[in-house]
């Protein structure tokens, strides 16, 4: 896992190395303070060979040099270190999120059907951010603290070997304590992160569906459901906190014993005349420079434990396999005719589930309009979703112009199929930018022309800023009919040879339906058009109507032919016209 993460770090290794070098200088400067104290005590105050004026003179020079170093030299070094560290870590996170976003766009509809959006977002935002601590702590600060400890110990050995050995007495206990606590802490951190992601996933769904909550007046019930998720997170967070508190209490106890031992041994040596008072004072100063980094290392282990847990979750997402892949030798094939052949196609969402579609055979000619009807759950929309490869067939094949759709590059295939759904998604951007999703390189004139053909131009011009009006999240500032017309404008802009209308007008009022149906009639002209419809009055003009029940095609024909047959279609049509 760490090795994989380091692949993201590798391009910035020289910046990290530079950050460590600058950090060594930054952390090395405070090590002058204990030596200054020793000089002030032994070299000036207790130096009976100097007069009072000479003592003041020597002390003034020493303090002046120290002030110059700490006031003039150290601040820019600190700035450079902080800037380098933050720039590097943020750039690495940028690269990880970029890879994750591209990966998410390549994952199929199956992945999104099986995972909460909130949990996915939590991994891209929260977990990636948490891995930043691995960069700052694991790749930078830990090394700086270790180097600080080595330098401090070197100076302490130089000052007095016995005192240094006394300070090192507690090190084995320190290592044992870290070993005992932090394996358990990593597991608890992973559980806490998962619980937090569940809270975020629940919250994301309920905020998006707040209108449903309010319409059924179930705020109290949803508050209870949220409290269950929140309580689960609290329980795991407190368990993590308790174990973390145990570890810090144990570690701090061990590191607090060290200075007490050193002061006791040092005072005895000073009384016996083995060391000077200045040496003891300097040694006590270096104790903080020794045990301070040790305590930070303990905190670093906690931080890294959390970072590793998040890293696990990030790579779990990166390792999600693409179940929709470009086949070997796939090409950006141009669809010239738009003929579709569905050949013995069966489909099931998961291996342990019953098939949704069973041995479907159907040929659709160039420019033909074919409607799929039937009871809900029969497999109409599922069949439609197989054509742009939102899912892959379980068995059989789908051909377009004689080419298996798996021979197309996925992007090339989908770009040549226009899809208008019942609930079209608009992004939180302007009207113009939402239309441009159909073809991002289109000119303003082409955008306006597409809007006119979709019967959208007039209402757009009545908006406060026209085409520059912000539509809000998911197009919340627009009506259902207005959103649908913008989605149709996208298709006009893209001008694909194949058109799929999946319940495109079923949720609209009669006036909006009439306006949109007019635009759809223009849009479907001279294109192979597939329509999924519950409202049968909207598809009586179709060249072919296909009735699907329980995953099988049970009837095929024109409206007139199927009415005359008095079968499944005639039954559905009669019910709707009672």
Swiss-Prot record:
Membrane topology classification: Multi-pass membrane protein
GO molecular function: ABC-type oligopeptide transporter activity; ATP binding; ATP hydrolysis activity
Activity control mechanisms: ATPase activity is inhibited by orthovanadate and activated by the cancer drugs doxorubicin and vinblastine.
Ranges for domain ABC transporter: 340-575
EC number: 7.6.2.-
Limits of the ABC transmembrane type-1 domain: 16-306
Listed InterPro entries: AAA+_ATPase, ABC1_TM_dom, ABC1_TM_sf, ABC_transporter-like_ATP-bd, ABC_transporter-like_CS, P-loop_NTPase, Type_1_exporter
Regions crossing the membrane: 16-36, 60-80, 139-159, 163-183, 245-263, 270-287
Any one Pfam family match given in the protein's UniProt record, by short name: ABC_membrane
Function (record text): May be involved in multidrug export. Transmembrane domains (TMD) form a pore in the cell membrane and the ATP-binding domain (NBD) is responsible for energy generation.
Subunit structure: Homodimer.
Protein's recorded name: Putative multidrug export ATP-binding/permease protein SAV1866
Native organism: Staphylococcus aureus (strain Mu50 / ATCC 700699)
């Amino acid at each position: 896992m760490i090795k994989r993460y380091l692949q993201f770090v590798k391009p910035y290794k020289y910046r990290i190395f530079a950050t460590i070098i600058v950090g060594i200088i930054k952390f090395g400067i405070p090590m002058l303070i204990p030596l200054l104290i020793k000089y002030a005590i032994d070299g000036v105050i207790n130096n009976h060979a100097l007069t009072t004026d000479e003592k003041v003179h020597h002390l003034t020079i020493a303090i002046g040099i120290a002030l110059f170093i700490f006031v003039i030299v150290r601040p820019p070094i600190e700035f450079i270190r902080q800037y380098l560290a933050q720039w590097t870590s943020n750039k690495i996170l940028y690269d990880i999120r970029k890879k994750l976003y591209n990966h998410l766009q390549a994952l199929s509809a199956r992945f999104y059907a099986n995972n909460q959006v909130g949990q996915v977002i939590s991994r891209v935002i929260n977990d990636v951010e948490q891995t930043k601590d691995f960069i700052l702590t694991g790749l930078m600060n830990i090394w700086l603290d270790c180097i600080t400890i080595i330098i401090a110990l070197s100076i302490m050995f130089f000052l007095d070997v016995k005192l240094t050995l006394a300070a090192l007495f507690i090190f084995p206990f320190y290592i044992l304590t870290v070993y005992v606590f932090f394996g358990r802490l990593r597991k608890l951190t992973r559980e806490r992160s998962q619980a937090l992601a569940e809270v975020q996933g629940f919250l994301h769904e309920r905020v998006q569906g707040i209108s449903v909550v309010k319409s059924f007046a179930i705020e109290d019930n949803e508050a209870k459901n949220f409290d269950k998720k929140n309580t689960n997170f609290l329980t795991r967070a407190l368990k993590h906190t308790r174990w973390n508190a145990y570890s810090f209490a144990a570690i701090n106890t061990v590191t607090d014993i060290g200075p007490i031992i050193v002061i006791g041994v040092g005072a005895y040596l000073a009384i016996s005349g083995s060391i000077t008072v200045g040496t003891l004072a300097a040694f006590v100063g270096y104790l903080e420079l020794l045990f301070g980094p040790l305590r930070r290392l303990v905190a670093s282990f906690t931080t890294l434990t959390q970072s590793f847990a998040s890293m696990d979750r990030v790579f779990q997402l990166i390792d999600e396999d693409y179940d929709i892949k470009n086949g070997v030798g796939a090409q950006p094939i141009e669809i010239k005719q738009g003929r579709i052949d569905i050949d013995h196609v069966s489909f099931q969402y998961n291996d342990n589930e019953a098939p949704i579609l069973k041995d479907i055979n159907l040929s659709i000619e160039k420019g033909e309009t074919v409607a799929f009807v039937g009871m809900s759950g029969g497999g109409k929309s599922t069949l439609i979703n197989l054509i742009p490869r939102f899912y892959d067939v379980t068995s059989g094949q789908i051909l377009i112009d004689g080419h298996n759709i798996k021979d197309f590059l996925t992007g090339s295939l989908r770009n040549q199929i226009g899809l208008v759904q019942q609930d079209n998604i608009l992004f939180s951007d302007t009207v113009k930018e939402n239309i441009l999703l159909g073809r991002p390189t289109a000119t303003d004139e082409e955008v306006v022309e597409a809007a006119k053909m979709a019967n959208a131009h007039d209402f757009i011009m009545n908006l406060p800023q026209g085409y520059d009006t912000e539509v809000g999240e998911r197009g919340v500032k627009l009506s259902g009919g207005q959103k649908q017309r913008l989605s149709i404008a996208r298709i006009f802009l893209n001008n694909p040879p194949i058109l799929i209308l999946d319940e495109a007008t079923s949720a609209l009022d009669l006036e909006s339906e009439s306006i949109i149906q007019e635009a759809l009639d223009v849009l479907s002209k001279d294109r192979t058009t597939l329509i999924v419809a519950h409202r049968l009055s909207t598809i009586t003009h179709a060249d072919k109507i296909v009735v699907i029940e329980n995953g099988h095609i049970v009837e095929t024909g024109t409206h007139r032919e199927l009415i005359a047959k008095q079968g499944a279609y005639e039954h559905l049509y009669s019910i709707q016209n009672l």
